[in-house]
Structures are given as structure tokens and as C-alpha cells.
Design a protein with these regions (language model features):
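A short beta-loop-alpha structural element at the N-terminal edge
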Residues: 6-18
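Conserved GNAT-fold acetyl-CoA-binding loop/helix
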Residues: 20-45
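A short helix-loop-beta-strand connector motif used in the catalytic cores of GNAT acetyltransferases and
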Residues: 47-56, 84
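Conserved beta-strand in the GNAT
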Residues: 57, 63-72, 89
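A conserved beta-turn-beta hairpin within the catalytic core of GNAT-like acetyltransferases
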Residues: 74-85, 95, 142
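Conserved acetyl-CoA-binding loop-helix of GNAT-fold acetyltransferases
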Residues: 90, 96-109, 136
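Conserved active-site alpha-helix within GNAT-family acetyltransferase domains
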Residues: 101, 113, 125-143
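Conserved GNAT acetyl-CoA-binding A-motif
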Residues: 104, 112-122
Length: 151
């Protein structure tokens, strides 16, 4: 019998486990190159942004097995706050057990608590398993695309 999964806010001691999850995620997402130090800096910044960002982790038997990040932004289209979700990752041997669903449900609750009117989610268009998963949870593709410019 597998032990219960707990969804909770990440803390600094989760850093190494979260970096490992990002390493696995970035192996799939070809737009990004894994650089553990850069990811550590990014996660540390998110952990400090307590009012406008959230990192949730899924933990089983004291092991972090999944994560999800979100940040609040102002949407002129919505006339208020929206949340953008990134970095949804579940350890490979733990997929298909509802952990991703629990993470996204908890992140939606966090966004509602912070008065968000809409959620946006970034996903790799080639990751068909993830796209199917998101669509099963009610996420819909839009006509918008994400453009990027390095500074």
C-alpha cells in the first residue's frame, strides 16, 4: 500500500528535490537547458515572493515527488489578477496516480484565494501526454502563443 500524498507549500529544504524535478521536466521541454544553479536561483526567488508567487510540492513518505509553480500578474483582459502556472512536474514512477491533479487543484485554490480571475498554464506543445492530461482537467488551448526574447 502506498502512503498518502500531502500537497504543501515548498520550503527551502525542498530545493534539491525541486531542482531534480526541473531537470526531468527540462529534459522534455526542448526550449530550456537545465542549469541547476540557475534553477536554484529561480526557485529561491519564487520562495521569497510570498504574496505573488507559490511553489507547491507533493510529498509522500517525506519525499518530494511532484511540484508546481505559479505567479500572479495583472490581466487587462480580465480587469484584474490572473495566475500563470509553470513547472508542473511529477516524478516518473509516480505519474498516473492523481498527483498532478492534486497539485493543480491546490494551485487553483491558491489562485482563487488571491482573487485571480483566470489561470494560464504554459506547456510544451510536443508533450502530448501532458496536453491530454490538462485537457482532461478542463484546460483549453487558446489562439495565443508564447513568444520569448532573451535579454
Amino acid at each position: 500500500m502506498t502512503s498518502e500524498v500531502v500537497i504543501r507549500k515548498a520550503v527551502s529544504t525542498d530545493m534539491d528535490a525541486m531542482i531534480e524535478l526541473l531537470r526531468l521536466l527540462f529534459a522534455i521541454e526542448t526550449d530550456f537547458v537545465f542549469d541547476g544553479e540557475r534553477q536554484r536561483l529561480g526557485l529561491a526567488s519564487l520562495l521569497q515572493m510570498k504574496n505573488t508567487a507559490c511553489i507547491l510540492v507533493a510529498e509522500r513518505s517525506r519525499q518530494v515527488i511532484g511540484m508546481c509553480t505559479a505567479q500572479l500578474l495583472v490581466s487587462t483582459a480580465e480587469g484584474g489578477i490572473k495566475a500563470i502556472i509553470e513547472d508542473v512536474a511529477v516524478r516518473e514512477g509516480c505519474r498516473g496516480q492523481g498527483i498532478g491533479t492534486q497539485l493543480l487543484t491546490a494551485m487553483e485554490e491558491w489562485a482563487v484565494k488571491h482573487k485571480a480571475k483566470r489561470l494560464d498554464l504554459l506547456a510544451d506543445r510536443r508533450n502530448e501526454l501532458a496536453l491530454d492530461f490538462y485537457q482532461q482537467l478542463g484546460w483549453q488551448e487558446t489562439e495565443l502563443i508564447c513568444l520569448q526574447k532573451k535579454l
